[in-house]
Amino acid sequence: MALLTTGKPFIRDLEQYGALGVYAPLEGGYEGRYQRRLRATGYNVLHITARGLGDLSAYLTGIHGVRPPHLGKKNIGREAAVGPVYFIPPIATYQLENLPPKSKGLVIWIIESFVLSSEEKQYLINLSQQEPRLKFVLELGGERYFRWQPLSKSLIAA
C-alpha cells in the first residue's frame, strides 16, 4: 500500500455503489484517513455503531422511541414499570435536512457491522439507492490491509 493514498478510488466506488463493506486492519488508523478524505471531498460523516440499533428503518428514517436506563429509580403509578419513553427524530432524515448547502451528502459510517443480518444490509443498500445523497460504509471485519467492496458483493459472499 502506498504511503500516501488519495482515496479517490474509495470515494468513486462509494458514489457509484452507495454502500460499501470495509475491511480494515485491527490496529486502526486507516479508517480515519478515509473519513478525513470524505470530509475534504464535501461529505458529512456520521459515526454510529451497529450494536443496539434495533429496527434500522425506524432508527434512520422514522421517529422512534427509546427508554433511558432507569438507574434503579421507579415512578410508581405514573409511567410504565420499565420507565418513560422519549421520542427521537430519525437520524438520517434529520441529518439530510440540515446538511450545508454545498455538501455532497451524508455518509453514515457504521462500525461493528458484522452483527447486522443480511436483510438489514440489503435495507441499507436499498436506502442508499432511494436517497442518492445518503451513503453507507460498513466495517465488516479485519484485514491485513485496508480494502473495500460493494456491500452487495459482500452479501453474495456471505
Swiss-Prot record:
Q: Which family does it belong to?
A: Belongs to the complex I NdhN subunit family.
Q: Does the keyword NADP apply?
A: yes
Q: According to Swiss-Prot or TrEMBL, what is its membrane topology?
A: Peripheral membrane protein
Compartments (UniProt record)? Cellular thylakoid membrane
GO molecular function terms attached to this record: oxidoreductase activity, acting on NAD(P)H, quinone or similar compound as acceptor; quinone binding
- Per the record, the major location class is membrane
EC category? translocase
Gene Ontology cellular component terms for the protein in this record: plasma membrane-derived thylakoid membrane
**Gene that specifies this protein:** ndhN
Entry superkingdom: Bacteria
- Catalytic reactions on record: a plastoquinone + NADH + (n+1) H(+)(in) = a plastoquinol + NAD(+) + n H(+)(out); a plastoquinone + NADPH + (n+1) H(+)(in) = a plastoquinol + NADP(+) + n H(+)(out)
Protein name as catalogued: NAD(P)H-quinone oxidoreductase subunit N
Pfam families named among the record's database cross-references: NdhN
Q: Which organism is it from?
A: Microcystis aeruginosa (strain NIES-843 / IAM M-2473)
